[in-house]
Each structure stands twice: as structure tokens, then as C-alpha cells.
């Protein structure tokens, strides 16, 4: 298999997902009119309405039946397993990269003759098994620290501020000094904390057990020249992981003992209401922030400075959103699904929905003329032009969903004071070896 995460970085920015294994034999039966039909199991809850609207419009234009079902946050793997076991299984689904593909390889049709593959600006970003194109990314995504410009400008104007402009915040040490000072002066700034709540409800915990955990993996893999899923990790940069997580806990809107029930919506609301200056999330968050009343000139995004190579560190950019066509579906349904995808990425309706309404940045040539309206995407594009090194999405190599969950549980226990950091180390290092072995036994 050849899939180069770092070549994906060379394109541009914007959701996160995880997908797992199933060994069922579901297939999809085509509709009676011979046109085939489409069933898309969508990963992104925040784009559910937009996908349903696209399905309705496509059916209106072509007469082809399109069904869209959306998995609740954190349940995609479970729902995909369930749906694939049915007679009318999804004709279109997603995997997160090579690890997800390994679990679903018997269900992936060759997409080399489909429009999404043909439209790729850089065909290296496709997911391949030998010469077979098994998945095509439809969103290049970026995350970091979203920041509120007006709150930071207010802080920069204070006497004794640890930074005088956003350009001064270019390292972990400066970021922490600013966050600590903002927390101490929160009444002057009219905020509840420097950072939004680090919630560990399933709608939020992925930000820490997956996205933040990507950074120690990235730096370890860079140092050790790891290019494929390793059987074990050392945890070389766990001290830096702890430093950033501690900052999130100490300089927060919320007492750490309350984090187990805090949600993604809570963090989004805190940030949109101006209760916090920093919010770890990605380009996909713009639609929710916009709905909450934020304006494009209110926000931008900084790297999650990790204290390893801050001078060169850029935002975290990659893809975990690969479309796959179900090879078990009827030929008519596979053709109908490919035709639907062609319409989605080449029609005015589809391009507008994906780029504007969903706020995604795609790797397709057909989107070249799209004006960027998402300020977080603009930050990602600017970051790529900065000469800095974008951090790869190495969490695609995480061995299992269980590894993430065990790490998340250890992080929450640590945050609440009911566990210690050694348990986080154990979940990270020992848990990796255990889950890798379980996934590769036999």
C-alpha cells in the first residue's frame, strides 16, 4: 500500500473521524428502474443537513434515489458495522486512511476511473493498494488553536502583557506565559478563562485523545523516521504532551473536576460568546462558530506550539476523510454512486454546498475558482505559504479506537485528580503495543 500523508499536506487545509473493522457480507440491491441508487453513510454530524439537501436536489434532477444517513458523533465505526450487515448496505462510506482501509479492504471498489480521482490536483493523496485506488479524500483539514482576535488585542494592550501582538506568540513558552497571564487577569479581560473547556464527553474528547495526541506521535515518528504503523511507540514526547494538556486544564473556563460532562457544544459556545480566547479545534468548526454569531474577521488560528521545534512548526494538516465505493453493491448502484460523486464535485450546487455551506477545503481541480470564505481555511492556506512545516496527521496510524478510548479515560482521570500521569503513559505506550498486537494477531 502506498499512501503518503505528507504529500497530502502540500495541498490545503479542513474533521476528524475514526473507522473500524467488520467482517460482514452486506450488499446493496439496485432500484427497480435500472438507474441504481445511492446510500451514503456520512461521518460528519455538522454537515448532515447539507448532505440531505444535496441528496434531495440530485434526486430531483436525475430521478436517482439518494439516501443519506449520518452517524452520531463517535459512533461511525459501530454504525458502519451495523449497516454493512444489512441487505441494503451503504454504497458510499468513509475510511480514515491505511488503518481503516485494512479493516474494510474487501469492501472497496477501484475508484481510478471515477471523477473524484480524476479531479485530484495531486493524485498522491489518494489511498491506494498497489495500483488500485481504494479511497479518495474529499476534504483536506487543518487544526490548531483557534483564537479570538478582539480578546487577544485587548490583552496585548494591557500593561505588562507577555506579548504585544499575535506574531509574538511563536513558541510554547510564550503561549503558556500569555495564557497564564490572561487567566490571572481574566476579570480585566471579561473572560472566564484563556482556553475553552477541555470536555471529555464523546463529542469533545477526540480533541485530546486523538488530535492533541497526534503531536507527540508526529515528533516521535519524525525523530525515528517511522513511515508506517509501528508495532510499538516510546512516548518520547509525552512530557510535552503533558505540558500542553496541563495548560489547557489550568488556564480554562472550567474546573477540571467538571470536565467529564462538558461537551463540544459547550466549548463552541464558550468561544463564540467571548468567554475564552483560545479553542483547540479545526477548520470544520467554522460553520458552528458562524451559526453562533461569530464574524469571519473575529477569528484565526495558531499552531499548537509543542516545545519541540516551535520555530518551524505549522498547523496540523491532512485528511481522514476518504470516500470509498462499496464493491459489494450491485454494479448499477456502484455506477450510480460514482455518478453522484461526479455531480457533487463538479456541479455548481455541489461545489457551493461543500465549499461554502460545509466550509470544507477540497483537493479537487474543480474547486480552483472557489473563493475562501472560511477564515480558518484562510489561516491554513496562509500557514502553508509561510515556509513552516505542517504537522502530519499521524493519528491515522493509531492502532485502534480502543487505544484512543483508554488514553482518553486516563487523561480524564488525570484531569479530575483521580489518576496520575503514569497511567496516561501506560495507556499511550503499553496500550499501543497491546492494541497493535490484538489488531495483527494471526
Task: Name the predicted role of every residue range.
Residues 3-14, 18-19, 23-100, 113-116, ...:
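Conserved N-terminal structural module of periplasmic/extracytoplasmic solute-binding proteins
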Residues 70-79, 170-174, 259-273:
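Short helix-initiation/N-cap motifs at beta->coil->alpha
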Residues 91-94, 277-281, 300:
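Paired acidic/hydrophobic, glycine-rich loop segments that form the ligand-binding mouth/hinge
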Residues 96-153, 298-303, 385:
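Hinge/lid segment of periplasmic solute-binding proteins
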Residues 132-138, 143, 173-229, 276:
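Extracytoplasmic/periplasmic solute-binding protein
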Residues 179-180, 224-261:
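Glycine-centered hinge/linker elements that transmit conformational signals in sensory
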Residues 261, 317, 360-362, 379-434:
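C-terminal capping/gating helix-and-loop segments adjacent to ligand/active sites or protein-protein/ligand interfaces
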Residues 292-359:
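Extracytoplasmic/periplasmic substrate-recognition and gating elements
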